[in-house]
Amino acid sequence: MEADWDELSRIPVPPPSPHGLPTVATTIAFDDVSELLWAGNEFGRITSFYGPELQRYTSVRAHPVSDGPVRQILFHERGVISLSPKSVHMITRRGLTQWHISHEEMTDLYCMSFTAQLNKIIVAGCQRAMFTIDIDKGIIVDKLHTDHNYTMMKKSRYLCAATDTGSVNALSLTDFRVVKSWKSHGTAINDMDARNDLLVTCGFSVRHLGSPIVDPLANVYDLKTLSPLPPIPFHAGAAYVRMHPKLSTTSFVASQTGQLQVVDLMNPNAINLRQANVSFMLGIDISPSGEALAINDAECSIHLWGSPSKIHFNEMSKEVEFADVVPRPPPLDWSPDTPLNMIGMPYYRERLLSAWPSHLVFEVGSPPAPIDQSLIPYLRPAEMGHYAPNPKKTRRYQVENTRALTTAEPALIAPKFLSEKAREQSKFKSEASVSDTAEALAGAKLNGEAEDDPLLKYSNVEIKYSRFGVDDFDFSFSGLETHIANSFTNALLQLLKFIPLVRNLALHHAASTCIYETCLLCEMGYLFDMLEKANGQNCQATNLLKTFSSYREASNLGLLEENLTTKSLSSAIQSVNRFFLNQIAHDFRMIVPSSDDLDHRLSTIASESIRCMFCQNEIVRPGNSLANELIYPTIDIKQARRNPAFRFSSILRASIERETQNRGWCNYCRRYQQVTIRKSIHRMPLVLILNAALSNAICRRLWSIPGWLPEEVGIAVDNGQVMCFEGDELKTQLQNKLPNLVVYELVGLVSEIDIPEHQKPHLVSFINVSISSREPEAKNRWHLFNDFLVTEVDKDEALRFNQPWKSPCILAYQVKDARHAVDDSWKNVLDTTLLFRDWSLNGGRAVETRQTLTEEEKPTPGTPVALDTEFVDLEKAEIDVKADGSQEIVRPSKSGLARVSVLRGSGVHEGVPFIDDYITIKEPIVDYVTQYSGIKPGDLDPRTSQHNLVPLKVAYKKLWLLLNLGCVFVGHGLASDFRKINIQVPKSQTVDTQYLYFHPGKNRRLSLRYLAWAVFKEYIQEEPADNNQGHDSIEDARMALRLWKKFQEYEDAGIVNQILEEIFREGSKLGFRPPPRNGVATVLSRPGTAVTMQNSSGRNTPSTPDVGGAATATATTSAPATPRQAFRRSIALTPSNGTFSGPGAGDFFGGSPLK
């Protein structure tokens, strides 16, 4: 007990009914899984309290009133177990009942404890029967007879059980026989605790007058030698005792009058005394962390003691689930003036009149070939148009068949854009349930006819972009987009993400100290985290694929998309699989070179014997492998079904214990000879990744056999030999308990789809998503991942390969024991040092625009930060202009992150930047868009830049750390910024002022420039006299932060609707742009009034009017602002990513209605 320990909280025990009086707690206990304190009362009700403030969390009637009081509470990972005299009950921590057990021989239960098996407990009491209960099944599995009445149980080296006569029995944990018994106290034992090898008891004895009184000694026993140790003197009367969970020889001893003593059992003279403010103590308990102590008294109160600076109940607690806030339905403004298009129209499902049949559509000529985007950076102006070096991708006099390009893709019925839905319903209406992509595609055929076609979901899918960007789509599952170079790896990335052990490895590595710019394992961690946070929105693997493209080895091996013209997709993805696994291993060892965690998970540990067939000389070298290729025997298809050598398990065994013959150099013969190479396996990995390696049509016949690919295989390694089993043979070996047998289950596979009907080959993945689910699922659920189209499929369909257009490429098996092994502990070990130190590529030049965070400012969940980013153009958008003049975005513009500014959103330094990084870009920059981004040539070059220049990996990791620390990002138009950064932020961590200041009756988003003027009468983002200046991201982020604070003031005052009405009324007059500085302008004051601004002062911010007088202000004299399109806000009408509201107050400015 440290010097600053004191009473932190005191709460009354909740009454048994809403109008009842508080009652005494019959038992209290700290939860060893979550930050909860549990208490039970005499009416059979158990209640939990959250955190140091002891907030009410759950309250459940666990036992009928007739069963008596709650006498003990135990904790399991799956729930909470309570005991009353006549029943045992288990609930989840949210209060849902798991099971309830009562028995005719359960008459006076007092205690319970875990046994040697962690899924079983034993319950006992003042009765002649003890019961063993299986927690998982909720049933009694055994009944034991006993000659003792037990009142208390504690588990340590033995099961220590106190009797009602003052004795303590040490019971065996396996058969519960009495190993040793001590007469500890004369009358009864009041409390005891056992931990490690020590047992301490407190109790009563009879003195002179014949009535029992509390013993002034706490008895101590050594469970290792089963002998008593010197007792602990405690003159106030030792009534209660608890052993410290961390300090093995330290115990807390308490009296009934509230005196607390912390004593070392090995040194009784070293004591620490405290006095609790209680009239009569009924019990104590100490938290698993040792940092909190709970006291239960006779005045119906619970006291919490601890250190105010560092109290917590557990070292590693699971997050406590709280109830969702139920949104209130928005009021419907129904009046004669309400336009009917506010009500919305239903979605169509039948065929539209505009869908003309194919026999009425005729070709009228081929469109010109589109310009290769790779030529754009090299274009040079000429007298007419531009010119560039010829890339020589076609032969001489060869032209491109552009008609084939337009008709190669099937006519797929795409789902509705969200922007189309926005015309039918307002933002504040709850989004109606719409069919997912698979349902939207169902019923269409490749030729456009409305008939069912099972091949449609396997077809090539291409995103049709709207002018609002890709966030304008509405899909029910998170897929990966296809418009990025090397996106043919999407199927493999999805497969790796759904392997729990690979997913855990990547996320833990991403949370480490790694800041290597080309770390593929980090990028996988970022992508997997993004896919989990997306909740059905599309994601893109831009950063990962950019890193993959930067590897010279990948280019030399022909693994990039530009090199696949002469290589099949199947062989290419298998080569990429080997490259990914090797690079993952390399990246992992760069941070933890001495750890074998990756080898344990992914690597087949083996030795390779090479023997010369001429001289029989043999050498042995390591032969570890990360990916195994299947080797097929010479196949007689007639015997394939009956011959065991053609079973998958046999082929797998031969592939792992690969034995080959070829020519090699013999050091003994000093010449090339015929050598035999054979592998001896020492250990199999937890994750087994296989390349199918289908080299000919004969091997493919095996796969076409129904049920040939098993869902489960068993592998046993014995003295370097591998044994593989499947089907009934595997079940037999499991029943016989074959040593070292490990069962693997199929997580998923990557397949090549080659439908010959005017389609190009592409890759899909079939994944059993139940394996990676956090909650146990009895049924396997298989899904087809076809880039951004995700569809649930039947298991037989996923594992059937008797179609000529479907070929297996990569298989992934994982040990069955790792099912649902989704580990989120990486969030608790995030390495945040990058946020607290400077990092620069250009020699650490002084940065005056920011002030680095201190340790005292470490972000916590809910910490607001203001964000703004700037981008440069790497590629222009590809737009197809149709014959009727309409435009369709074929491929969006490609932007590169150039600057990131993050400001503190609260505290003493509110509004002060702590991140202001410029990002170096190695790709050719088409346009710096200086007028809008403020980025000038040379700003991103380490040799000439005067700013803090960092790699993209460092800037991205800072934002990723803030995201996973729980920060709330405040900004304007964040949806566009997040997409270009390639990061997924949940709605609960986003405050977008573009959606805060949105009127439900106006289909318009307001620019930050206009909002700054409308709310604060300030001019930002003005047209500079020098076009080489442009925007300032710090200014934009600070303005967004101030707008949020001001909006909170409007909410507190209840005038949000009036303010929005006034803002939109004035905006419609001014074209939603700030008025020119010269001239008279009418600005907002309060609802229903106006203020006239005169030109006089020349300041950015107009003068603040007096609070009590007429609201007047002055504006500056300047050149009028030229209307222009905000480049960085080009998707101002993108669907909302959500809003965040919370307590806070901003400054009061002139014209505020709060005045």
Curated annotation (Swiss-Prot):
Residues 1110-1123 have a biased composition (Low complexity). The keyword Transmembrane helix does not apply. Residues 453-816 form the USP domain. WD repeats lie at residues 20-59, 102-145, 276-315. GO terms for cellular component: P-body; PAN complex. One of its GO terms (molecular function) is nucleic acid binding. Contains a pseudo-UCH domain. This ubiquitin C-terminal hydrolase (UCH)-like or ubiquitin specific protease (USP)-like domain is predicted to be catalytically inactive because it lacks the active site catalytic triad characteristic of thiol proteases, with residues at the equivalent structural positions that are incompatible with catalysis, and it cannot bind ubiquitin. It functions as a structural scaffold for intra- and intermolecular interactions in the complex. This is PAN2-PAN3 deadenylation complex catalytic subunit pan2. The lineage of its organism: Eukaryota, Fungi, Dikarya, Ascomycota, Pezizomycotina. The gene is pan2n2.
